[in-house]
Amino acid sequence: MSGYLVDLHVHSAESSYCGHVPAHEIVSAYREAGFDGIAITDHYGGYFFDKIKELPWPEQVDRFMRGYEEAKAAAEGTGFKVYFGIEYRDRITVDDFLVFGLDRQFLLDNPDLPDNPLKEAAERIHAYGGFIIQAHPARIRYAMALGQKLFMGFRTVDMVEHMKTGEKLPEIDWAERDALIGKPSQLTSLRMCYLREPDSLDGVEVYNGNPTWAMDGYAAEKYADEHPEYVRIAASDFHSYPCGMGGTYFDHLPENDAALVRALQEKRVVDFHIGHDVHVAPVKGK
C-alpha cells in the first residue's frame, strides 16, 4: 500500500486508566508493525482528572501528558512520528471526540474544558486551531435485565452477527441503561457516541478497531455521507495487544502536530488499514 500509515487513536498506560501498555513499548510495537506514526490520544475528562484533583492543575496536566511525552522520547531519532491528541469527553454525555492541534499551554489555560458541553468546548478548540473528529460513532452495546442486575457481557462478534440479521431491537441511550433493571428481560441496544453536534465537528472515525465494542458501520458511513465536509479516518483505539488494528494512510508523513492538522483539513487521506471486522457494514474508503 502506498502512503504513510498512522494510527490516530492510541492510549498509553501512563495516562489512560484503561491503557495497559507503556508508551515506550507502544512505539516499539508500532514500528515493528510497519506504521510510520501514532497519535497518543489518552482519555481527557473528569474520569481522569477527578482521581488526581488534589494536585495543582499544572501537575494534573503533567500527569496527563506523561504518556505522550514518554512515547515522543522513545521515538526520538528513529523517524517514527508521535503526535499529541486527546480523546475528549464532557461531563454531560458519554460521547468521545479525538482532538488534535492542542498543546500543554491550551490545557493549562482551560482547566474547565470537560465541564462544558461539546459546542462550547469546540469553540475554544477551534479558536486555538484544533481539529475535532467524532470517535467511534454509533457504538453499540447490548443489554438485558436479569432481575435486579443488568447483563452487558455479550461478545462483540455475537452482537455484530446479530446486527447483520437486521432484527430491530428496542433502543435507549447509554445513560438511561439503569432504567432496564427490574423490568421484564428483553434484549436492548444501548446507543452511545452518535452525532449530537455535527456542526462542531471536522471529521468522523468511520472504522474503529477496538474489539471490545460493536459499531454500526451503516450509521457511521451514513454520518460521513451526510457531511461531505468531514475527513474520514480509520484507527485502532489501541488499549492493549494486538496493536495496529486500524490506521489511516496519508499521502505524506506530517512532520509535527500542526502539519497533522493541515493534512486532516486538506483531507490528505489516501486509504485505510482495516485490522479486523467489528462493523456491520464494510468501510467504503476515504
Where are these regions (language model features)?
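Extracellular glycoside hydrolase catalytic/binding regions
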Residues: 137-140
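Charged catalytic cores and adjacent phosphate/nucleic-acid-binding surfaces used
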Residues: 1-16, 20-29, 92-108, 123, ...
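Surface-exposed amphipathic alpha-helices with a cationic face
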Residues: 31, 69-76, 119-133, 220-228
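An N-terminally biased module of ancient metal coordination in phosphate/nucleic-acid-related enzymes
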Residues: 1-91, 115, 240-242
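Conserved beta-strand termini and adjacent loop/short-helix elements that scaffold enzyme active sites
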Residues: 85-87, 135, 235
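Conserved beta-strand positions in the central sheet of alpha/beta enzyme cores
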Residues: 39-40, 133-134, 205
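Active-site substrate-binding loop(s) of clan PA
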Residues: 111-120
